[in-house]
């Protein structure tokens, strides 16, 4: 009867004849057990003798003799032996279960619990019963149902199954319709609907249909007559109706004109036309004095003031011959000329502040100082959190949002928020279906220009990132950062199961598979192994049922 009870679990897997072997099987020859073990490991549909797998390390062998020779070495490495049948185990829970089967197997009563004396017909029922006794030793308790767990991760998985989802807080309420939202930007987008409705109603009242016939005669009234189109939100007036329509988009947030290159949106078409010159490189406004070209007309007007100022200062300066005739009047300031203006044409160009490194000129000295930091590498603005230095204050402000978590730039399509406007502009291209950046060599298209630049290095063979330690060059900066860890000895990827750390993430992934082969996530009831703990928890539900 005992032999029948102990022989039953062998159908569940190759590890069961060793794990739950009774006293009557101690005298059996090892080669017979190994031969049975090798046959049980054969997959269906294969001829006998083709595949034999070790129950401990899952290694496969072509014949049972090779398996038997390997098993002697494999068992010798297992640290925990059973004193009843000399069976060895890698983990203490497996040995404890194995010893309980030896102690509980009684021919007449079946399997008896050594703690409370309860008897069971099968060993699986005994193991499930023993888990109830061991539950009191688990340190983590569920606050809802008093169930205990070994790990915090098991408690979190249990709470997700048992506790109902907490409703999301929606503190932002619309004052017009009472609808609530979880985030402020969602409420702002929603309120545009009410603003558009109010604009339509106000436009229908203020801009009603004019009676047919001759146009109405101008009436005295000043701005109301000259600018008949008034905004219902802010009261601003316009001469033409298209200007009013374009102005309404300031209140509604509508931006119908989208750039096909980068996806940025604008309220007016002239803004889009001016923006597209950044991508095309067009500079239609030339300077008549020096020939320099500008992308926008305001930039040309600002630049032309430099030439006018130089021309006025040159005309106000005295003739060079007057230095020889009358030197004393030179000490008096000329009429109509500021005290700080230059005196000679040779000194006139001093108004332009030129960079001594690259020759670039600037109108103000502070602009020159900001520019010279690019050559000197000076970074006077330091972050108080991490100590990182920046050359411009705007860069420090943008970096500080990394520590504060502030993300003021929100996407209108999906609501995702970003800490910098450039990141939002790059994200908008993900919503655009087109891929404007096309490789001229192979025709592959990309959404972002940096991706195209990195791809083109494949065709050109360019490797601009050079290691300062060994001189090895790379095409991408991430590869250089990963390579430099060889020289610095940095190992940022640590294994959570042991004390080893690695310089590459791929090496950590390969290393963690060794823990899985050792049975890191192994079921204590049936011995089945899993790649991660979540799958093990899902598997244990079958035994609980």
UniProtKB/Swiss-Prot annotation:
Q: Where are the zinc fingers (C2H2-type)?
A: 52-74, 80-102, 111-133, 140-162, 172-194, 229-251, 257-279, 285-307, 353-375, 381-403, 409-431, 437-459, 465-487, 493-515, 521-543
| PROSITE patterns listed in its UniProt record | ZINC_FINGER_C2H2_1, ZINC_FINGER_C2H2_2
Q: Which residues carry this modification: N6-acetyllysine?
A: 39, 269
Induction profile: Increased in bone tissue of an iron-overload-induced and in an ovariectomy-induced mouse model of osteoporosis (at protein level).
Q: Please give the chief subcellular localization of this protein.
A: nucleus
GO cellular component term of the entry, any = cytosolic ribosome
Disordered: annotated span = 1-50
What happens without the gene? Answer: Conditional knockdown in the whole animal, the liver, or in adipose tissue leads to a reduction in body weight and body fat mass despite normal food intake; animals exhibit an increased insulin sensitivity. Furthermore, conditional knockdown in the whole animal leads to reduced levels of inflammatory infiltrates in adipose tissue, conditional knockdown in adipose tissue leads to a reduction in adipocyte size and higher oxygen consumption, and conditional knockdown in the liver leads to higher oxygen consumption and activity, a reduction in liver triacylglycerol levels and adipocyte size.
| Residues with the Phosphoserine modification | 27
Q: Which SMART domains match?
A: ZnF_C2H2
Tell me which Gene Ontology terms the entry assigns under biological process: positive regulation of D-glucose import; regulation of fatty acid transport; regulation of transcription by RNA polymerase II
GO MF annotations for this entry?
sequence-specific DNA binding; zinc ion binding
* Keyword annotations: Acetylation, Cytoplasm, DNA-binding, Metal-binding, Nucleus, Phosphoprotein, Repeat, Zinc, Zinc-finger
Q: Which domain of life is it from?
A: Eukaryota
Q: What does this protein do?
A: Sequence-specific double-stranded DNA-binding protein. Binds ATT-rich and T-rich DNA sequences and facilitates DNA bending. May regulate the expression of genes involved in cellular fatty acid import, including SCARB1/CD36, and genes involved in lipid droplet formation. May regulate the expression of LCN2, and thereby influence iron metabolism and apoptosis-related pathways. May regulate the expression of genes involved in glucose transport.
**Protein name in UniProt:** DNA-binding protein REPIN1
Biological classification of the source: Eukaryota, Metazoa, Chordata, Craniata, Vertebrata
